[in-house]
Regions:
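Conserved alpha-helix/loop element of class I SAM-dependent methyltransferases that forms part
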Residues: 35-54
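Class I SAM-dependent methyltransferase SAM/SAH-binding core
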Residues: 67, 71, 75-109
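S-adenosyl-L-methionine-dependent methyltransferase catalytic module, highlighting the catalytic core
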Residues: 113-115, 122, 126-127, 135-254
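Hydrophobic adenine-recognition pocket in adenosine-nucleotide-binding enzymes
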Residues: 130
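Class I SAM-dependent methyltransferase Rossmann-like catalytic core
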Residues: 26-37
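Conserved class I S-adenosyl-L-methionine
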Residues: 56-64
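N-terminal, positively charged/glycine-rich alpha-helical extensions of SAM-dependent methyltransferases
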Residues: 1-28
């Protein structure tokens, strides 16, 4: 009877984007179009973060059904997970009961921009599959930087191309043709849809991802998987840039 109840609850909570492997062996999306997702992605990334996260506070942005939330909690972290979609949060809260994480995980319905109104800071920020859905990605990165104490794992949809280059401190108006170099940081704007999704707004190239990360005050430690970067909250921007960003944040967020 318990098995039938679980099957019914999984179906009622669907559709699922995260294929969770539940404690009794059931899977929430065994026929996922991407395969066993996000398990295969976790296997690529997990070796690049500490195996023991005891004492760490972690923020999972765009947590969906909570796959990464639960994996990070398994390593001992106290995880705050946010999403703006009540469907996914319903799945995540239900799944948390199956895994019995108790008070080690907390789910909040909120936008990434709402983080600026909280006093929370985090040792690790998990920022995967969200940036390209945001109309204001650099604003989001600026906010995230103010919440980060140690590390950030960032994944975003990207344009094809791996080229990067050493960027000059300044260029003249007459040198703008340099921006046509494939290695110059650039980001494609998606006015309509990509893969039938109206929330896919941006596709930066690798150089642009790394440049935006640096411009928000992170250091790029390395590319650890396809379209995925490990970043450190150690890069200090010049004071004049920090003051400018803070002023824009106050104006944009009303804080």
């Amino acid at each position: 009877m318990r098995a039938e109840v679980l099957d019914g609850e999984i179906e009622a909570l669907g559709p699922w984007f995260h294929n969770l492997h539940l404690p009794d062996g059931r899977q929430t999306a065994p026929d996922h179009a991407l395969g066993d997702f996000p398990t295969f992605k976790w296997e690529e990334i997990s070796q690049h973060i500490p195996a023991d996260l005891t004492g760490w506070r972690v923020l999972d942005i765009g947590c969906n059904a909570g796959f990464y939330t639960f994996k990070l909690a398994e390593r001992g972290a106290q995880v705050t997970a946010i999403d703006s979609d009540p469907l996914y949060l319903g799945q995540a809260r239900w799944a948390a009961e199956q895994f019995d994480f108790g008070n080690r995980v907390e789910f909040r319905e909120m936008q990434i921009y709402d983080l600026i109104r909280t006093d929370d800071t985090f040792d690790l920020i998990w920022f995967m599959g969200v940036l390209y859905h945001l109309r204001h990605p650099l604003l989001a990165l600026d906010i995230v930087r103010r919440k980060a104490r140690k590390l950030m794992v960032l994944q975003t949809l990207s344009m094809p191309g791996e080229e990067t280059t050493s960027l000059p401190q300044d260029i003249t108006l007459g040198e703008r043709d340099r921006m046509l170099d494939p290695a110059w940081p650039k980001m494609a704007f998606i006015e309509r849809k990509l893969r039938r999704d109206i929330t896919n707004w941006w596709a930066p190239n690798r150089a642009c991802v790394e440049a935006m990360v640096r411009a928000s005050g992170f250091a790029v430690k390395g590319k650890i998987a396809d379209e995925t970067y490990l970043c450190e909250a150690a890069h200090q921007l010049p004071e004049i840039e920090t003051q400018m960003i803070d002023a824009e944040l106050r104006a944009a967020t009303g804080t």
